[in-house]
From Swiss-Prot:
Keyword ATP-binding: no
Origin: domain of life: Eukaryota
Entry text on domains: The RxLR-dEER motif acts to carry the protein into the host cell cytoplasm through binding to cell surface phosphatidylinositol-3-phosphate.
Motif (RxLR-dEER): 44-58
Name of this protein: RxLR effector protein SFI7
Organism this protein belongs to: Phytophthora infestans (strain T30-4) (Potato late blight agent)
UniProt subcellular location: Secreted; Host cytoplasm; Host cell membrane
Family: Belongs to the RxLR effector family.
Any single GO CC term annotated in Swiss-Prot or TrEMBL for this entry: extracellular region
The gene coding this protein: SFI7
Sorted UniProt keywords: Glycoprotein, Host cell membrane, Host cytoplasm, Host membrane, Membrane, Secreted, Signal, Virulence
Signal peptide positions on this chain: 1-22
Functional summary from the UniProt entry: Effector that suppresses flg22-induced post-translational MAP kinase activation in tomato but not in Arabidopsis. The perception of highly conserved pathogen- or microbe-associated molecular patterns (PAMPs/MAMPs), such as flg22, triggers converging signaling pathways recruiting MAP kinase cascades and inducing transcriptional re-programming, yielding a generic antimicrobial response. Also partially attenuates INF1-triggered cell death.
Keyword Secreted attached: yes
Glycosylation sites: N32
């Protein structure tokens, strides 16, 4: 224990005397800064995560290998099929959802839920919540009777 203490004191003395630590300069032209630099601009005091800034949206669905945003998926993919009257089972197969077990983890699950909500509104004129649409898909649409 005493040997470690002596070694620690000796190392500290050598580093302090040798100039390995930050130096203090008395000249006015030289200044060592440690810490934050003050700024006169009004800024937020909280840190903010950097924004993406490139204008790209995150992929919401991937259909036939093409990544699409939510707006593109609804406009270019779901609305034309809704206008054609495509049923939900056919759309699920077209999107690549083939089994009930893996359906909720599929990359196009949210698009299928959105389509069921749109389909229900077009046919019945009633709005459906997302949780209700997910339940209907799992218990009534993606069943063994429908070959899922």
């Amino acid at each position: 224990m005493r040997a470690y203490f002596v070694l620690l004191v000796a190392a500290t003395a050598i580093l302090t005397y040798g100039g390995a630590t930050a130096t203090y300069s008395t000249s006015k032209g030289e200044m060592n800064l440690t810490g934050t630099v003050e700024n006169n601009r009004p800024t937020r005091s909280l840190r903010v995560a950097p924004s993406g800034g490139n204008g790209e949206e995150r992929s919401w669905s991937t259909i036939y290998g093409i990544s699409r945003s939510k707006a593109e998926t609804v406009r270019d993919w779901l609305m034309p099929r809704l206008n054609q009257g495509m049923d939900v089972q056919a759309l699920a197969r077209e999107m690549g959802i083939t089994s009930r077990q893996a359906a909720t983890q599929h990359q196009n699950w949210d698009a299928l839920v959105k389509y069921l909500k749109m389909y229900n509104y077009a046919v019945r004129g009633e709005k459906m919540s997302k949780s209700m649409a997910e339940s209907v898909l799992l218990h009534n649409v993606l069943t063994a009777k429908n070959n899922f």
